[in-house]
Amino acid sequence: MLRKRPEASAEKYQQVWTPEGSPLAVHTARQARLLRERMAIPVAYAMRYGEPAIRSVLETLDEPLVVPLYPQYSESTTATVADLLPPGVRMVEQFHDHPAYIAALAANVRRYWDAHGRGARLLMSFHGLPKRGSERYEGECRATAALLAQALKVDSYLVTFQSRFGYAEWLRPYTEPTLRELAAKGAQRVDVVCPGFVSDCLETLEEIGIAARKAFLDAGGRELRLVPCLNESPEWISALEQIARA
């Protein structure tokens, strides 16, 4: 498994790589620049895994506020960022139900629907985690989904969890099997939105946009449409400012 996973990941990254680099890094850098211009204060970005590293970036800032771009809190993401912070550094723990974040998500989906029409089914896919110890995370994911559905005035939607690996039980239902089941039951066109990812990345572009789409089509579906993440949408940059100032 250890021999195969790096090669498999490299192949997947090749499918979504841009001339500017990793989509996640590109979008995050742009968000930081736009927020800096909007707030007229120093704004820097860092990566939990990779460069620029969190600790090295913190050394360049006075009285920093850290905003992990994980809307829903979990021990495996947000908490690991907190573990790296020196004493006294402030951090936003979560923003899964922040009105500006929900409004940005809703505006993003509406913009896509205005341009491309609305699919017959709406599926909200969040990053999965092992089920044990993830009660808070799951609750916040489902709360985000409910608030987004309310903002969109959608009565029927599905919540699923992706990115599972290994043999332990993860949060259910799983995204790809759910899509196959939908296709087998006659669903022809499904819209997928990933509210837990604020930037398009490997998990959205490849895992949903390529692999899950293929699984859906192979099972008899006609069209799986991936709604882009928030990326550099003006509503999201505004939401980031409101989250930071709260």
Which residues does each predicted region cover?
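Active-site-proximal alpha-helix that buttresses catalytic centers in soluble enzyme cores
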Residues: 1-246
